[in-house]
Amino acid sequence: MALSKTAQPMQSSLRKIAVVVATAVSGMSAYAHAAETPKKEETITVTAAPAPQESAWGPAATIAARQSATGTKTDTSIEKVPQSISVVTAEEMALHQPRSVKEALSYTPGVAVGTRGASNTYDYLIIRGFAADGQSQNNYLDGMKMQGNFYNDAVIDPYMIERAEVMRGPTSVLYGKSSPGGLLNMVSKRPLTEPLKEVQFKVGTDSLFQTGFDFSDALDDDGVYSYRLTGLARSNNAQQERAEEQRYTIAPSFSWRPSDKTNFTFLSYFQNEPETGYYGWLPKEGTVDPLPNGDRLPTDFNEGAKNNTYSRNQKMVGYSFDHEFNDTFTVRQNLRFAENKTSQNSVYGYGVCSDAANSGNALCNALSPADKGHYLARKYVVDDEKLQNFTVDTQLQSKFATGDVDHILLTGVDYMRMRNDINAWFGYDASVPLLDLYNPVYSDFDFDSKNPANSGPYQLLNKQQQTGLYVQDQAQWNKVLVTLGGRYDWAEQDSFNRVTGTTASRDDNQFTWRGGVNYLFDNGVTPYFSYSESFEPSSQSDAQGKPFAPSKGKQYEVGVKYVPGDRPIVLTGALYQLTKTNNLMADPAGSFFSVEGGEIRARGVEIEAKAALSASVNVVGSYTYTDVEYTTDTNYKGNTPAQVPEHMASLWGDYTFYDGALSGLTLGTGGRFSSSSYGDPANSFKVGSYAVMDALVR
């Protein structure tokens, strides 16, 4: 059994102290007042104030969130969404102490988070057996896509968000172009009208040093104006030697609430990462399989050059606005402008010299057959990118009734524009020395000679646009809830090659829809059935230079949810079949180009439990079964896609003491299991199963 190399933090939180003191003062004040004027036969009636209504865009009181907007774009109870939704609250993240959002999803069903090992450079996810097309993430912040391109993807620190939500299955009916497996949506921390004062310090293994703060309060007596200021600074070594992670983040926000019907919130996010950590490729020789001499590589092995660097800078500004005209009509608008810059100088592994992919490497061909099995071929990349992204989503929500049927009708239009300026050079030549895995010798690489500012074969200006019109009706008659929605998208992409002076363009128009039925029993049990669709444009072209048509996803899902009204418990189970058509595959004629027509089918079962059993006890558990297969493909028909484990399971529990000498102490432990998965689509080798144990003392 392997232990994770996640640091075990020591944390000090001023927020907990403030809560305890405030409670004690409040209690003494009430007691003193009652003692002032004792009366005979006095009857005192105590009425508990109702708990504040949870909002899909705000904090949840426990680890078991009951509301979400990710699945409907409206503030909807989880049991009323006809698809699988998982919510990881800030409370749960505080228990697990993740260093990335993908780590925060480690106990979430249907999501494979460890496809790049311990690397936290990106939050790449495989959901229900599918990853996003190309290198881009399928991640959203406050309901708007953080559109990435090439190596330029934004990453949000988990300390800066209130929720991380995963919607599994096709989502194009609400969000447009998307991976068929699902998406991740993060909800930013927002201003509060009650005082919040938190300062934290962490130290841990891998030379972890972190400090963070989270302040919020109203700026006036009426709570019309409020602010929130959240920040973090962290430095730690990555698991691989000679790799470091540094992050400095601050997120100021401001809210204006002139009435209980109007809310305007300014949101911003600024993050600088001088070093994003390790992002390379380890060979199967020495990791999955032993080297020819029987040895294995150390767990901190790094195949890169001594002077590898990978930095990123992010800036985001925007707002969230909503206004309730009356009991029927509410308008909402979310808007954001983002700018991301990445700079990378990296040497990375490309398999041992005996691999067929390295048959054209002159350095490999100079070796004897016996040596090819322990010499690692390497490539380099020199890359500078500047990406700008603008997104706006405007919605009109209408609540009304037609006879005995209550409706929540949502109509909306959203627009996204992305521009990424790429200057890159990559490949391998005699200047990239081989690495002897028996006795690796590291040196600096002359990246300046490959500087793309001077010249480079990969100088592109990539542009993407998407406009979508959508409508959705949540119609409830007694205990039957029908959700029906449709969307039409206009998607454009252009790639201008500065080297050749040519432009490749592709326009796609696509209609997608979703239908679902839920039956709401009085005891909190809700069975449901749904059908949903997705589409995902391709950036590749055929042998004649014609861009490929989008791939499409179709899913049938049946499940049951248990969300009792009087207890913080969420239990869900789902059974689904998901098919991706028009997947790209190798040309049967043997050319180096791909062709359309491939198909991948996924079937699976997912079970999740989240429960705050008492004020002291939390339990989180999940199980995932995923059966994915290339049903139509030139080379891989019948095979399983890479990096998709058949089984995953997790269980977590924690206990907080509220009395005695241990009052305020929280103890927790958990475990995660993943079965083996194939390392390539040819299914030529497997990466073994593993189990990881987690522990908490706070």
Regions found by a protein language model. Name each.
Residues 6, 17-19, 35, 385, ...:
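Conserved C-terminal beta-signal and adjacent last beta-strands/turns
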Residues 255-259, 387, 406-418, 460-580:
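Structural signature of Gram-negative outer-membrane beta-barrels, strongest in the C-terminal barrel
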Residues 317-339, 378-496:
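Face-selective signature of the C-terminal outer-membrane beta-barrel domain
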Residues 479, 577, 596-681:
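Gram-negative outer-membrane beta-barrel transporters
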